């Protein structure tokens, strides 16, 4: 997908593009990523441990334990590699009144979401390597898990892991002041 294809037909007649970019697609460790990868590696280790123990006890009857190792490794690998893979297919655009996020993940199709930038929009810089500009949030409701109601969770939305985040933050502040 070319960068401009995602934006075709989305802009108002008098709306102008002031910035376009794409996030860094490298691996960015987060607490949830480390925790989920740890759970996956635990299952992989326990499956392999059971497999080797069954071989030493009574012969090759523990091959069914390989499935636990496989699922554990897949679970860990997914949580480490998937976020960077998804960012590789993400594009950002800032106009004089809206922020757009487009994703064109293979086999999933193109999705484009816009967020208005008004004087009431809370915009913040999230430090990192590279930093992110957060400008919206979304409440996600989680189902009950293990008889515990986990309640709603707030998910931050923005231009994640962009090298020129400080410049984009300044552009967004200018939009809020009406000077874009």
Model-derived regions: residue spans:
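Short, charged cytosolic
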Residues: 1-21
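Membrane-proximal intrinsically disordered regions of secretory-pathway and membrane-system proteins
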Residues: 11, 15-18, 110-111, 116-125, ...
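Conserved beta-hairpin
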Residues: 19, 75-116
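Alpha-helical transmembrane spans
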Residues: 26-91
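Acidic, Ser/Thr-rich low-complexity segments on the non-lumenal side of membrane proteins
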Residues: 98, 102-143
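A membrane-cytosol interface segment of integral membrane proteins
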Residues: 127-180
């Amino acid at each position: 997908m070319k960068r401009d294809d995602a934006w075709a037909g989305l802009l108002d007649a008098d709306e102008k593009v002031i910035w376009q970019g794409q996030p860094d697609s490298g691996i960015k460790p987060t607490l949830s990523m480390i925790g989920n990868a740890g759970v996956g590696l635990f299952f992989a280790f326990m499956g392999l441990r059971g497999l080797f123990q069954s071989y030493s006890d009574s012969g090759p009857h523990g091959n069914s334990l390989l499935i636990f190792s496989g699922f554990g490794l897949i679970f860990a690998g997914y949580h480490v590699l998937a976020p960077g893979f998804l960012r590789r297919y993400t594009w950002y655009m800032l106009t004089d009144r809206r922020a757009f996020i487009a994703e064109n993940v293979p086999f999933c199709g193109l999705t484009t979401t816009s967020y208005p930038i008004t004087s009431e929009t809370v915009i913040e810089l999230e430090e990192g390597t590279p930093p992110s500009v957060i400008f919206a949030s979304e409440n996600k409701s989680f189902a009950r898990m293990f008889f515990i109601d986990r309640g709603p969770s707030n998910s931050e939305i923005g231009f994640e892991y962009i090298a020129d985040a400080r410049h984009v933050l300044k552009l967004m502040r200018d939009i809020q002041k009406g000077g874009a």
